[in-house]
């Protein structure tokens, strides 16, 4: 198993903290986001990591290549990171993702390492880390059936307050089998971009595939674990209170 980390974004809402560095280089309690994530992956047995870089990509590439010489670190460039979204960053790593089962992670997260281990050790070939809805959650939600199969993806514009107790937030960490990636997901992403462009989210394709029954995706609950997604300086302050 390998990991793909999406780290091309600008992180403009973090202000001066990302003036000269990629978003994932921001420290949380003295540890950079990207260092925390790579160390957790290494402790979980992952040795090959593909990082998709964009904003301040050369600085990030040089930093990681020098720091993690004991690992198989590979880099993919998104030269148009400022006019595309993460669906395109993911697609740029498609040749690597055809080689092995893959963990897909976004680089602006702090998580408990046990969340990664639960995902890796799950017998499900294709799975997503999810967390019961909380008021601070933003972005895509999912619903699940009694067996923790994800039954729908719900974009923010389609939220219904009365249904919030049924919602789970996607943590933005997934496990995909090589077969699913090669036979289904990557071709679907390519077709989606040809039809609708490159400025969208990879979860939109998962949404459509789930609705049409093209994927069986298991939800792995992060209930009881600490995690946070960092988009703003306010998020950073919260993250520093809840993680070591």
Task: Name each region found by the language model.
Residues 2-5, 31-100, 195:
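Conserved N-terminal catalytic core of the sugar/cofactor nucleotidyltransferase
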Residues 1-3, 167-244:
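Conserved alpha/beta core of the MobA/IspD/sugar-nucleotide pyrophosphorylase nucleotidyltransferase superfamily
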Residues 65-146:
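Conserved beta-loop-beta/alpha segment of the NTase-like Rossmann-fold superfamily
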Residues 1-19:
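N-terminal nucleotide-binding beta1-loop-alpha1 segment
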Residues 20-35:
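Short catalytic helix/loop segments, enriched in acidic residues and glycine
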């Amino acid at each position: 198993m390998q990991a793909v980390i999406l780290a091309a974004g600008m992180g403009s809402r973090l202000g001066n903290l990302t003036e000269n560095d990629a978003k994932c280089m921001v420290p949380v309690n003295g540890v950079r986001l990207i260092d925390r994530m790579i160390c957790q992956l290494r402790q979980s047995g992952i040795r090959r990591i593909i990082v998709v870089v964009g904003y301040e990509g050369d600085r990030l590439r040089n930093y990681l290549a020098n720091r993690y010489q004991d690992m198989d670190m590979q880099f993919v460039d998104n030269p148009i990171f400022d006019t595309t979204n993460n669906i395109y960053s993911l697609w740029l790593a498609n040749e690597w993702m055809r080689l092995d089962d893959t963990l897909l992670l976004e680089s602006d997260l702090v998580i408990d390492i046990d969340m990664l281990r639960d995902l890796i050790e799950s017998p499900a070939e294709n799975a997503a880390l999810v967390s019961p809805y909380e008021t601070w959650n933003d972005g895509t939600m999912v619903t699940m059936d009694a067996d923790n199969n994800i039954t729908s993806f719900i974009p923010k514009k389609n939220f219904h307050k009365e249904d919030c107790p049924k919602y789970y937030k996607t943590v933005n960490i997934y496990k995909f089998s090589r077969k699913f990636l090669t036979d289904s997901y990557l071709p679907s992403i390519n077709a989606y971009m040809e039809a609708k462009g490159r400025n969208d989210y990879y979860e939109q394709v998962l949404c459509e595939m789930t609705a049409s029954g093209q994927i069986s995706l298991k939800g792995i609950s992060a209930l009881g674990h600490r995690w946070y997604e960092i988009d703003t300086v306010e998020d950073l302050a919260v993250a520093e209170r809840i993680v070591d």
